[in-house]
Amino acid sequence: MAGPAPGTIMGEDYFGNASEWGEEADGGQHQEDDSGEGEDDAEVQQECLHKFSTRDYIMEPSIFNTLKRYFQAGGSPENVIQLLSENYTAVAQTVNLLAEWLIQTGVEPVQVQETVENHLKSLLIKHFDPRKADSIFTEEGETPAWLEQMIAHTTWRDLFYKLAEAHPDCLMLNFTVKLISDAGYQGEITSVSTACQQLEVFSRVLRTSLATILDGGEENLEKNLPEFAKMVCHGEHTYLFAQAMMSVLAQEEQGGSAVRRVAQEVQRFAQEKGHDASQITLALGTAASYPRACQALGAMLSRGALNPADITVLFKMFTSMDPPPVELIRVPAFLDLFMQSLFKPGAKINQDHKHKYIHILAYAASVVETWKKNKRVSIGKDELKSTSKAIETVHNLCCNENKGASELVAELSTLYQCIRFPVVAMGVLKWVDWTVSEPRYFQLQTDHTPVHLALLDEISTCHQLLHPQVLQLLVKLFETEHSQLDVMEQLELKKTLLDRMVHLLSRGYVLPVVSYIRKCLEKLDTDISLIRYFVTEVLDVIAPPYTSDFVQLFLPILENDSIAGTIKAEGEHDPVTEFIAHCKSNFIVVN
């Protein structure tokens, strides 16, 4: 029979050699001997013979232990030889032989190894018994050598992560995960239940994951945040621990604001999953020093709605001579409630209390406090009055159901002035989203560019931080099926939305916009004429020098067979050819 194939999983590197198993078997003998005192020799022989008759028992680690018991009970060697040889099917050796054959037929050794390992992994996952694993682990009394060897290999670490996810109460697996973490592989432990079983492991994974998010920056936040938030929101204990740690880090001058942003995104994730974490949020902030304000805030956050009674409590506190810290009301979930109350079409708000709502939102958005040694030394309210007026003006325009599109056009200059305030821009963006998402909105429009979409251009121009939300809304509208419109009307609408994306690109939000159009081209679910339209519009507004990232994204769109050669040149001016030539001569293009 062929020996082990190079690189296959059956070698001694994974499971040790026979002498090691023998020593372990001898070491475990005393326990069995003690428990087996007085056993009838015939019973022992019968038990051992039953084991010898099972398939491939000669390959089992306990073979030496069983042989010793059998011979001590007076067993016959002939029976052993006959049973072991008759039941030897050589599964492991056959795998190695097949692996050798595959390699000899030209298959890469690495590919053969992956095939064997993946099949073995699937079998282990299917047949794993946590009780047996725990019993074997308990009998060992120390960390088995084979386990330490296994965790040195990526394949088997991945197996342990999957098993730990499926069997969170298995002691052997939890211990193994800690071993993996101790060995410095905590960056791999992204599985929720695996990371959350032990505080020491969770702390390491939390630290590594948070560092990855902070180092990745805004552009990688969408990719890195969901797994992190899912892990933190695994349970109340993990949420409290993580938020408490981030609350402390958020106080640091360097990088503190970025950590606070991550903490707020996790709060939003918890809220979207239906968890009420408002009390933890308030307890970790400054609210604990203001129990009445804390009670009012907590009540509104828990209900997910503002109410006049609690708003009045906060209004009195924030119009007093010594108001609470503005940080108290700068809770994203709380500010979102103001968006719904003040900017959602058709929202009803008690007119007697409206000024209180507006004042608190304006206060949260505009007041600047100066602190030294944990003492507030000044409160800057220079922009409070103008912010309040802008919010009130736009609220009256947005929530007035009697104002149609034509009336809004007459108020555009006023809206543009008010949009310069960031909080108003956010409110207008929400209002536009709610309005244009109405099924019949575009059916009733006669203008080429509806006024609501024109407002998005102004928001893009004034507020760089709102670019992601603007693109998100445009993408949602672009991908929506407007079945109430005919085919030509749908194409015209999508061209209008592409115009907004091109404007967004011209305001500096380049890579996300081009990346989205590139995905549309690759998915083959967008009319190719729309891609050509986008390319033409972009070529009209760009000029060298270009960044390498932009070229790597945009050039493949132009070189696509459906695009190249289909965009008409204007006289002698051929922007597509000129752009491609410029890129070829100035960049090394990676396919």
Swiss-Prot record:
Gene Ontology CC? NELF complex
Single GO molecular function: RNA binding
Question: What UniProt keywords are attached to this protein's entry?
Answer: Nucleus, Repressor, RNA-binding, Transcription, Transcription regulation
Task: Name the segments for region: Disordered.
Answer: 1-44
User: Where does the UniProt entry say this protein principally localizes?
Assistant: nucleus
Where's it found, cell-wise? Nucleus
Gene Ontology terms describing biological process: negative regulation of transcription elongation by RNA polymerase II
Q: Where in the sequence does UniProt note compositional bias of the Acidic residues kind?
A: 34-44
Q: Which Pfam families match?
A: TH1
In terms of superkingdom, the source organism counts as Eukaryota
**Protein's job:** Essential component of the NELF complex, a complex that negatively regulates the elongation of transcription by RNA polymerase II. The NELF complex, which acts via an association with the DSIF complex and causes transcriptional pausing, is counteracted by the P-TEFb kinase complex.
Can you tell me which family this protein belongs to? Belongs to the NELF-D family.
The record's note on quaternary structure and interaction partners says: The NELF complex is composed of NELFA, NELFB, NELFCD and NELFE; NELFA and NELFCD form a stable subcomplex that binds primarily through NELFCD to the N-terminus of NELFB. Binds RNA which may help to stabilize the NELF complex on nucleic acid. In vitro, the NELFA:NELFCD subcomplex binds to ssDNA and ssRNA in a sequence- and structure-dependent manner. Interacts with ARAF1. Interacts with PCF11. Interacts with NELFB. Interacts with KAT8.
Q: What is this protein called?
A: Negative elongation factor D
Q: Could you tell me which species this protein originates from? A: Mus musculus (Mouse)
Q: Which gene encodes it?
A: Nelfcd
